[in-house]
């Protein structure tokens, strides 16, 4: 019992620290791509502390409730991943958290929040089927939905699931709202959206959504690590290279509209998934 409590504490604090560092590294890489110096690595933590120091102001109580539910869902999903629980359960919990964030935005009458929320729903509809297909592929290869069993597999999954890893990269780009799929909100506010999904979040409540996002980043990178679980070096290299390409694509891509997003993600994602699943079945 004490060991489990310690693991939960390490998962929450470590996830917060790692998520903030990844966010800081994202900013530094983005600055380098744009020939800028960029902020220090710890800047996301300074921003988070500044948000916590602000006055707590919400549009309505439901908005704050949804923000708490969002960060609770993402933290629970991360803890379950660290405890090596069931992968399907983790995907379901993170999806519930994403829906709560949308519901919180819909509770506002701001047109920017409304548009951002509807676009976020479309993004959820685009990446969730892909995550499920990737999970099915992992199960067909390992015969296990348990993360403990997947990590104990005797060869890197990417060797047998290369197309599904590409599909996971697509889902990762949409999930993290990176260009060209930053339709609902982004770190760089768009003219017609302002801040979109997060327009009416501010102060400590906005800080909660940022913490939830950090947990999501760590969770989805943990998902990527399943594809090279045979040794730590390969796992770290795979995750690092994957996130580097996510940042690179974010900086060289123009934003698509939702029709292009659904067309590209579903057409390419479902096609690659089908090819890889047939390969597994035949092989």
Task: Mark where each language-model region is.
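Alpha-helical transmembrane segments of multi-pass membrane proteins predominantly involved
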Residues: 1-283
